[in-house]
């Protein structure tokens, strides 16, 4: 690497004892221009999660009507060797990561549909025009479901259930993998859902009317320890409106609690045109950790104090990364890529020329601050 005015130092190798995830995508009828932002979204998840087993994904481009941007179907396994919780369904991407081996040979780990009729923005810069939906954001959201931000809730009449979903509930959409017999067992995500008065959903009669009432109470919480820690000690709100919506209820963060502009907005049920979010957010990452995922060591879960946060712009960056380091003393900054290589600079930091770095996900650390900022290089 040639010398620069900001004194970039030679790259060295950092050794981590973990392997970030690899997401292998098969595209079905997806136009080439749409494959770029979908792959970009996958690279974000790859930089976050740790797994020795490649994650196999099928993406299908098909008309889904006017109200739906995407639909995800995770494959599942339960009671596998090393399963942390028995009698519980795990998405196979997570089950494979926990088992350290592929449990579903010849099958996809999850499949998702994207609406071919929607007006999509195919860029990866987050500059989504009014009237268009950001495909990176939606693909990132759907992959979040496939990786485990998903449950097995259903309500018919007054009766709610966990683990009674049928493939016919989602007709005419189908999956290439065999639909498992769920046997009235909850998913690992469901194990953390609770009503403030009636307790955890998996303690309720299943199927049952008390369970059904909780599912439409607008009061559901996620009671995982990491999620609570990332939410200031409070259980995050889960979307549970008074009218049950299959595929939306009980499998998203609450829309009104985490509206557009909130760092946790990605995994809420609704998306707006003209907006973009290319990061899962601290609550989603904490929930992933609660259900069993190992998060890469350079990924921070909690939000930093807004008045003392390190800032970077633009993000994604093409060549020049501008830094805001709101600390009076000079510090060392380290940029680490997904391969473990680091570029160091010292002194007062204003900007770094990254034009020679390959595209991908990176993390910026500033010595002595305890902060990590993620950014994408195009």
Where are the language model's segments positioned?
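Short, glycine-anchored, charge-dense loop/turn motifs used at functional sites
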Residues: 335-343, 362
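Residue-level detector of functionally pivotal "anchor" positions at catalytic/ligand-binding pockets or at interdomain
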Residues: 295-313, 319, 326, 342
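Glycine-centered tight-turn motifs at strand-turn-strand junctions
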Residues: 342-358, 371-372
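Extracellular zinc-dependent metalloprotease catalytic-domain scaffold
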Residues: 20-140, 146-297
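Bacterial Sec-dependent N-terminal signal peptides
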Residues: 1-22
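C-terminal tail/sorting-segment detector
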Residues: 3, 359-378
């Amino acid at each position: 690497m040639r010398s620069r005015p900001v004194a970039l130092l030679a790259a060295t190798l950092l050794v981590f004892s973990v392997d970030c995830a690899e997401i292998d995508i098969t595209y079905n009828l997806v136009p080439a221009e749409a494959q770029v932002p979908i792959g970009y979204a996958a690279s974000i998840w790859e930089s976050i999660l740790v797994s020795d087993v490649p994650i196999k994904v099928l993406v299908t481009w098909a008309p889904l009507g006017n109200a739906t941007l995407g639909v995800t179907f995770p494959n599942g396994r339960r009671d596998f060797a090393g399963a942390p919780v028995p009698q519980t369904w795990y998405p196979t991407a997570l089950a494979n990561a926990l088992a350290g081996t592929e449990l579903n040979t010849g099958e996809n780990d999850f499949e998702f549909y994207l609406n071919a009729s929607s007006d999509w923005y195919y860029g990866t810069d987050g500059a989504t025009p009014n009237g268009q939906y950001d495909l990176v954001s939606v693909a990132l959201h759907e992959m979040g479901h496939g990786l485990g931000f998903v449950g097995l809730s259903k309500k018919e009449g007054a009766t709610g259930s966990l683990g009674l979903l049928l493939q016919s509930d989602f007709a005419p959409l189908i999956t290439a993998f065999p639909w498992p017999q769920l046997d009235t067992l909850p998913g690992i995500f469901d194990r953390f859902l609770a009503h403030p008065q009636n307790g955890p959903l998996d303690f309720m009669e299943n199927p049952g009317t008390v369970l059904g009432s909780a599912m439409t109470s607008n009061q559901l919480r996620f009671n995982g320890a990491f999620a609570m820690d990332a939410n200031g000690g409070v259980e995050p709100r889960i979307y549970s409106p008074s009218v049950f919506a299959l595929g939306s209820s009980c499998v998203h963060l609450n829309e009104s609690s985490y509206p557009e502009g909130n760092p946790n907005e990605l995994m809420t049920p609704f998306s707006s045109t003209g907006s973009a979010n290319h990061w899962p957010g601290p609550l989603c990452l904490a929930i992933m950790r609660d259900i069993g995922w190992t998060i890469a060591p350079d990924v921070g879960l909690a939000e930093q104090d807004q008045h003392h946060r390190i800032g970077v712009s633009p993000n994604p960056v093409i060549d020049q990364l501008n830094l805001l380091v709101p600390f009076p003393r000079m510090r060392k900054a380290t940029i680490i890529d997904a391969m473990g290589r680091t570029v160091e600079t010292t002194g007062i930091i204003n900007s770094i020329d990254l034009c020679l770095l390959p595209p991908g996900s990176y993390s910026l650390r500033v010595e002595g601050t305890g902060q990590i900022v993620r950014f994408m290089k195009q």
